[in-house]
Regions:
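Beta1-alpha1 glycine-rich phosphate/pyrophosphate-binding loop at the start
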Residues: 1-69, 159-180
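Mid-to-C-terminal Rossmann-like scaffold of FAD/NAD(P)H-dependent oxidoreductases
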Residues: 1-2, 8, 277-370
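Short hydrophobic core segments
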Residues: 6, 95-105, 228-238, 291, ...
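Glycine-rich Rossmann-fold phosphate-binding loop(s) that bind the pyrophosphate
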Residues: 7-11, 126, 147-152
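A Rossmann-like FAD-binding core segment of flavoenzymes
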Residues: 25-27, 71-89, 95, 163-256, ...
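N-terminal glycine-rich dinucleotide-binding loop that anchors FAD/FMN and/or NAD(P) in oxidoreductases
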Residues: 42-71, 183-206, 321-323
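FAD-site-proximal beta/loop scaffold in flavoenzymes
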Residues: 118-141, 212, 216-221, 226-296
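Rossmann-like NAD(P)H-binding beta-loop-alpha module
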Residues: 133-181, 217
Length: 384
């Protein structure tokens, strides 16, 4: 049996590992644009100097050899022929498969602002190459602007605090980490980053990028009319699934990404998908689970992804531990809110309705986070 796995991050690696565990004699080929196996979630630790390249890895040293995997690294897939069952690569080669797992992840989304994608000093923050470029470029910068205050944007800012640069954050929402946190919890981080010298602009978007004769961004004009000097612009305004190479195939994609069912199957025979390439539930644990589920079904073991509770985020920026579960604001007035806080920086917010908990935010003391996770995930009625 010939298995081909596209992508060497959470979904692809967990899928390849599971394939080998279930089929000791199979031919397994792993294809990835990355030439390293590393966790994107902790790239900012590399920027900060807290971890070296080795400590970014999430597999054992001899993972490839131990699992007898043929790894074609530093190469992207350019197409899939589902009838003849082969994948074409950017180096001109092609690989035949019996079963294919697509786990190509996602890439930085650049909003349609003139010069944003073309300027030499504009970059995303998605992979190791981005990280190294930012580290190198920041050495010759005075002013760095990060666009987007989601988890990726805050990761970047955290990785830049040790530099001598002036760091600014621009966000269209009214607070930092708006998907994960309410205004109270977000304000704690906002104040903490402010004391570190980070200038923050909320409820403001980028209206125009002012460039020099070489096309480099020198200044950013906000929708408020304010301007920010800029030597390096880092875009953290979201991601898009890596499905461009599937455009001429018969594999179904929608506006989010690759379409799969609960078994990881696509509409094409013997083609499976997992992880961020689907554009849904873009968190690490979900990608790992989807990779395993897909591998099981590729090997004929009937498995389904039943756990779609992806609204869980744990963070610890600037030594402030926080966990967000489910919704962070009530959808309407039928929901009730319970809030506890103290002078030690501990904050707890519970959103409930008819005896069931739909969301929670814990900051500082994360006790009972495990219990709350299960109550929300299983929709347990706590009123009984």
């Amino acid at each position: 049996m010939k298995y081909v796995v596209l992508g060497a991050s959470a979904a692809g690696i967990s899928g390849a590992r599971q394939l080998r565990a279930l089929d000791k004699d199979a031919d397994i080929t792993l294809v990835s644009k990355d030439d390293k196996i590393y966790s994107r979630c902790i790239l900012h630790h590399y920027m900060e100097g807290i971890r070296d390249v080795k400590k970014l890895e999430f597999v054992e040293d001899n993972f490839i050899e131990k699992n007898n995997i043929n790894w074609i690294k530093g190469v992207s897939a350019t197409g899939v022929d589902v009838n003849k069952k082969y994948v074409t690569l950017e180096n001109g080669n092609s690989i035949e498969y019996d079963k294919l797992l697509i786990a190509t992840g996602a890439h930085t989304f650049f909003p349609p602002i003139p010069h944003l994608k073309t300027a030499k000093n504009s970059i995303g923050f998605r992979n190791f190459d981005d990280c190294e470029k930012i580290m190198e470029m920041s050495k010759n910068c005075k002013n760095i602007v990060v666009m987007g205050a989601g988890l990726v944007g805050i990761d970047v800012i955290s990785g830049l605090l040790h530099t001598d640069c002036n760091v600014s954050l621009v966000e269209m929402q009214d607070r930092m980490l708006s998907i994960q946190l309410d205004k109270k919890a977000a304000s704690v981080y906002e104040e903490a980053y402010s004391t570190k010298g980070v200038k923050q602009y909320y409820e403001k978007g980028v209206k125009e990028l002012i460039v020099d004769e070489d096309g480099n961004i020198k200044e950013i004009l906000l929708t408020s009319g304010e301007t920010i000097p800029c030597d390096l612009l880092i875009c953290a305004a979201g991601v898009r699934a890596n499905v461009e190479f599937l455009q001429n195939s018969e594999i179904e994609c929608d506006k989010f990404g690759l379409v799969i069912d609960t078994q990881g199957k696509t509409n094409a025979k013997d083609v499976f998908g997992a992880g961020d390439v689907t554009g849904r539930n873009p968190i690490w644990p979900t990608a790992v689970k989807e990779g395993i589920i897909a591998a099981n079904n590729m090997c004929g073991i009937n498995s389904e992804m039943t756990d779609f509770f992806a609204s869980k985020s744990t963070m610890n920026f600037l030594g402030i531990p926080t966990m967000s579960l489910g919704i962070n604001t009530p959808p309407d007035e039928t929901y009730q809110i319970e809030i506890e806080s103290d002078d030690d920086g501990n904050y707890k917010k519970i959103i409930h309705k008819d005896g069931k908990i739909y969301g929670a935010i814990l900051q500082g003391d994360l006790s009972y986070s495990g219990v709350l996770t299960q109550l929300i995930k299983r929709k347990i009625d706590v009123s009984k």
